Amino acid sequence: MSSESKTTPVQNWVLNAKEGVMALPRTIIDPLCPTRFTREAEPIRAAILSRAEFIERSKAEQDFRYKQIIPYIVLQHARKFLLIRRTPKQGETRLHDKFSLGIGGHINTIDKAEGDILETGMRRELNEEIKVHREEACRLVGVINDDTKEVDRVHLGLVYLLTCKTPGFTNREPEAYTALWQTPDEIAAVFEQMESWAKIVYEEVIRNKPA
């Protein structure tokens, strides 16, 4: 980076800060994401890149003035989606034995300061948990801002839809979760056992998605 190059507040913070998680004040989030699922994701994405802060995770979990930014990657092959079941060995105790439709985690200070930190963090989280053998495309399809559950009150979900050319994948954390491709009807059969974000993704992204 040249001496004349300008960096965003997020990039400057990453270059100098201690370990932390990316979070955005609710005063910024709620006007941009007034419902539980917002399809127009670019305004909140831009706000995150320009105005996000990094705070210690232990504090962030208790501070309801902020929401931690979580990339939530949904995998699709043909008309099937990857359904995940978290085991008791998975770190987040509030999600044990729940079904999920997304892979993801926090954006933190090990992610690159150069370029798009959201893209970098999303890719890091995906690659830590699963290896997609042949990817076709990946795009941001919406934002989850839901306060139904305690865990949701401090997290904001950026929902990415990753389409795969083939069904092949490698589970890098088999002790933490199991995963298999399922049709929308098969997913509907376990709807009541799904975590809250997965329910939202099923209703807003999968159920009414064109074939």
Model features per residue range: what roles?
Residues S2-I28, D97-I110, G142-A211:
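Nudix hydrolase/Nudix homology domain
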Residues I29-P34:
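Short N-terminal binding/cap micro-motifs at the start of the first secondary-structure element
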Residues T35-K80, R86-Q90:
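Acidic, metal-coordinating catalytic segment for phosphate/diphosphate chemistry
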Residues E61-R65, I110-E114, L118, T148, ...:
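Conserved aromatic-histidine-acidic binding/catalytic patches
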Residues I69-P71, L118, L158:
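Residue-level detector of short, conserved catalytic/binding motifs and their immediate flanks
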Residues K80-R124, E128:
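Conserved Nudix-box catalytic region and its N-terminal flanking loop in Nudix hydrolases
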Residues H133-G142:
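A short coil-to-beta-strand element that immediately follows conserved catalytic motifs
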